[in-house]
């Protein structure tokens, strides 16, 4: 059995610095050589031991997401897998930040594996694990009107005001192209790994959701910016599990024979007690 702790949508850019581990616990960690608890984010004490930690996007803006992922890896004693959400790219040039995220993760010496249409493979006591990761974005097709959904998203989603390309703002058309590339890559890579390594476990990690069922409060005209209806096309060659974020809707479910989970914290400033009491999810495969 392989144990994966997972969380998403921590939105640390919206959270002030705080002493995450108060009093004598923080003092002892500093003086006993124990890795310090991250100063921002959810409490990570008293969690079950995990083989891998998954951070499914909207962790922090820019390279700070990698910094936090490394702190989590050190504190929990497990490698961290990170995919970018849309918020990682806010106030950034996406074409420049993407390679910078890969480079920053590589400098952690294996503590953080950043994924974008790439695979992180682990040989663990419970077996071999392949984690396939990408932001995923969306096909804007959820409500049956791709053009209308793209126009609505361009007016109402901060992604298309706050994310930049080298010379222009990021547009829904750019998100759609990235989605199509990631979607094709997932199919090809799952098929290849099933053939080459049939005994291994395969877990997909995306930021955007793979089905309407996981929209939570984000239904209606904005829904196509949050999810695409993908699971039926993976029915014949499914991953063992799919972890996502983006919709701020916590769930554990099975659809089309695929276990789908999400553990978003959300905005501490907006979502109050639920965010403050947040605990990562635990997935066993």
Region roles according to the model:
Residues 11-17, 60-66, 87-97, 119-123, ...:
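Active-site environment of divalent metal-dependent phosphoester hydrolases
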């Amino acid at each position: 059995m392989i144990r994966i702790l997972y969380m998403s949508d921590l939105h640390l850019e919206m959270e002030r610095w705080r002493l995450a581990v108060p009093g004598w616990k923080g003092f002892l960690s500093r003086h006993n050589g124990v890795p310090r608890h991250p100063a921002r984010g959810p409490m990570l004490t008293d969690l079950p031991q995990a083989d891998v930690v998954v951070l499914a996007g909207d962790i922090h803006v820019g390279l700070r997401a990698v910094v936090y992922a490394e702190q989590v890896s050190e504190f929990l004693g497990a490698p961290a897998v990170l995919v970018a959400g849309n918020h990682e790219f806010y106030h950034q040039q996406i074409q420049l930040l993407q390679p910078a995220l890969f480079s920053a993760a590589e400098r952690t010496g294996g503590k953080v594996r950043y994924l974008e249409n790439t695979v992180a493979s682990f040989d663990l006591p419970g077996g071999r694990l392949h984690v396939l990761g990408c932001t995923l974005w969306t096909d804007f097709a959820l409500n049956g009107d791709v053009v209308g959904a793209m126009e609505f998203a361009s007016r109402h989603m901060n992604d298309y005001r706050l994310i930049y390309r080298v010379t222009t703002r990021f547009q829904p058309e750019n998100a759609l192209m990235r989605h199509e590339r990631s979607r094709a890559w997932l199919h090809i890579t799952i098929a290849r790994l099933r053939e080459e390594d049939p005994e291994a476990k395969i877990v997909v990690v995306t930021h955007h959701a793979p089905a309407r069922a996981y929209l939570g409060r984000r239904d209606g005209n904005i829904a196509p910016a949050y999810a695409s209806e993908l699971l039926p096309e993976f029915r014949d060659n499914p991953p063992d599990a799919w972890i996502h974020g983006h919709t701020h809707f916590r769930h554990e479910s099975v659809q089309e024979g695929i276990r789908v989970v999400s553990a978003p914290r959300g905005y501490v400033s907006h979502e109050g007690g639920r965010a403050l009491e947040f605990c990562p999810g635990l997935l066993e495969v």
